[in-house]
Design a protein with these regions (language model features):
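Loop-helix junctions at membrane interfaces
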Residues: 1-243
Length: 243
């Protein structure tokens, strides 16, 4: 815990930027969910008390899945594959976009307790923001009409948005920020990609050949698993927040 506070104190400005992004994501999710619920004449509260209990359980599962990260052969070691978006996506489909963002946020907090940041919070920021780009569009599309077809459409759109956003965010902000915080030249980071794939010679090359396939793979697998299990879990989740 002391190492966590030390990391926070050493990167106060970055942590504040991270918190601002979290607030923005919550506001976007809340405004959209309230608007859709009003359109559908749905009077259920956005965050009922019983929902929060399930959200807590899903957040803990997501944090454990985030720690269990796997290396991928086509990307440097600071990129990894995890399935922490799975509980968030399932929770978002069941309870709405706000629940999905809350699971993503609580996941990061729990993960930092289980395993302190090794990237000065850059990795956690990347995971939260990029994951929300999958969870938010998918759950919003599903919220308009809750059907299997709509869920598939939502996860496909979410995966594409996550991939596009993740690519731009890495190139424009995350990789330069990682370089700045750790004092590692961008050329050295690009070199890590070149060591794996000789065709990588620039930030854009690193993003196109590492970040894009990683996000497509992650989004595709998480979406597929969600579609396969959600129908069976849905009655249980709905019953849980009505009890």
């Amino acid at each position: 815990m002391s190492s966590l506070w030390q990391t926070v104190s050493e990167n106060v400005v970055f942590v504040l930027e991270f918190l601002a992004l979290i607030v923005v994501m919550f506001l976007i999710a809340y405004v959209i969910e309230k608007a859709v619920k009003k359109k559908n004449s749905d009077t259920e509260r956005v965050l009922a008390t019983r929902k929060i209990v399930v959200i807590g359980v899903f957040s803990a599962i997501a944090a454990i899945l985030m720690v269990l990260e796997f290396p991928v052969p086509f990307a440097p070691s600071f990129y990894g594959l995890d399935f922490s978006e799975l509980p968030a996506l399932i929770g978002a489909l069941a309870y709405g976009p706000v629940a999905g963002v809350m699971i993503e946020f609580c996941k990061i907090l729990i993960k930092l307790v289980l395993k302190p940041s090794s990237t000065a919070f850059v990795g956690e920021l990347a995971n939260f923001s990029i994951s929300c780009m999958l969870v938010l569009p998918a759950s919003v599309i599903y919220l308009f009409k809750k059907s299997r077809k709509q869920a598939i459409l939502g996860t496909v759109v979410g995966t594409l948005i996550m991939t596009a956003f993740g690519s731009c965010f890495n190139a424009i902000y995350l990789l330069p920020k990682f370089s700045e915080l750790y004092g590692i030249p961008l050329d050295a980071i690009i070199g890590m990609g070149t060591a794996i794939n000789p065709a990588i010679h620039s930030i854009s090359g690193l993003v196109l050949m590492c970040v894009v396939p990683l996000n497509l793979l992650k989004g595709g697998l998480v979406s597929l698993i969600t579609i396969l299990v959600y129908k069976k879990l849905s009655p249980i989740l709905k019953a849980a927040h009505k009890q």
